[in-house]
C-alpha cells in the first residue's frame, strides 16, 4: 500500500525545496565556497534519488537502516571511501539543518558511519560475505549454538537485545514465525528462513544436554541465558576465523535490511520486519499480512530460498 502519488509528489517537492534552502544556507550564511556547495548539491541529489527509488514519502520513514543502505549503495557503485565520507557528511549536515529548523525530531544519519579507508567494510556484509561467515560445519555445542544465533539474526533482522531475550515459547506456526518483543515492548512476528530453522533445530537437540528447566532459547554452558556481550564476542571470533573482518551483530541486521531492500524494494514490509512501524502490540495480524510478509520474504531473502 503505497501512499497516493499526490502525497508523494508533495513530499518530493518539499525535500527538493529543503535541499535548496540548505544550499542557500551553506553558501550565504556559512559562506562556504561554490565548489563545496556544488558538491553538497550533487551528494544530496543522489540521496534524493535513492529515497525516491525506495518510495520514501516522509522524513520519518528515513531510518538508520536506510541511511546505511544508501552508504552500501554508494559502495557498490565503487565510490572511494573518501567520496563516501563526503556524501555522508553532506547528508549529516542537511539533516542537522532539518532538525535545527524543526522539520524532523532527530537525524537518522547521526549514528551512521562510513568506512574510513578502503580496507574496512561498510556496515553491510554482501550476501557472499554472509555465505562465507556461515560456511563451516559446527563441531561442538558452542558452534552449533553460534550458528543458530547468526542464522537467526540474519534471517530475521533481529537486534542483538531481541536475540538474547528469545524464549522457546516464542516460536509460532510450527516454527516458521518467531514472535519478537522489540523496542518499547512492541511485538512483531518475523518469518524465518529454512537455514535458520535447520540451525535452530540442531541447537534445540544440542541444548537438551545443557538444560531443560529454562525457557531461554540461547544459553551458555552453565545453563543461563546468554548475554549480549557474549554474542558480540562470539560473532567477532567467528568472523575472524572465517577470514572476514570483525563483524558486529548490528551488521547482520543492516545486511538483512539492505539485502531485502535491494531485492524487493518494498520498504513498508521491511519496516514491519525490522519492527520500525508503529504496529501496536494489540494489533491483530490478519492471515493476509502474514502471507504478504512471507511472500516478500521468500522472494527477497538470500537465505530463505526454498
Region spans (language model):
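N-terminal core-binding DNA-recognition domain of tyrosine recombinases/integrases
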Residues: 12, 20-35, 41-121
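Conserved tyrosine-mediated DNA breakage-rejoining catalytic core shared by Y-recombinases
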Residues: 156, 161, 165-202
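Single conserved hydrophobic/aromatic residue that forms the stacking wall/gate
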Residues: 1-11
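Short, polar N-cap/turn motifs at the start of nucleic acid-interacting alpha helices
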Residues: 171-173, 227, 245-246, 265-286, ...
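C-terminal catalytic core of tyrosine-transesterase DNA break-rejoin enzymes
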Residues: 151, 155, 229, 237, ...
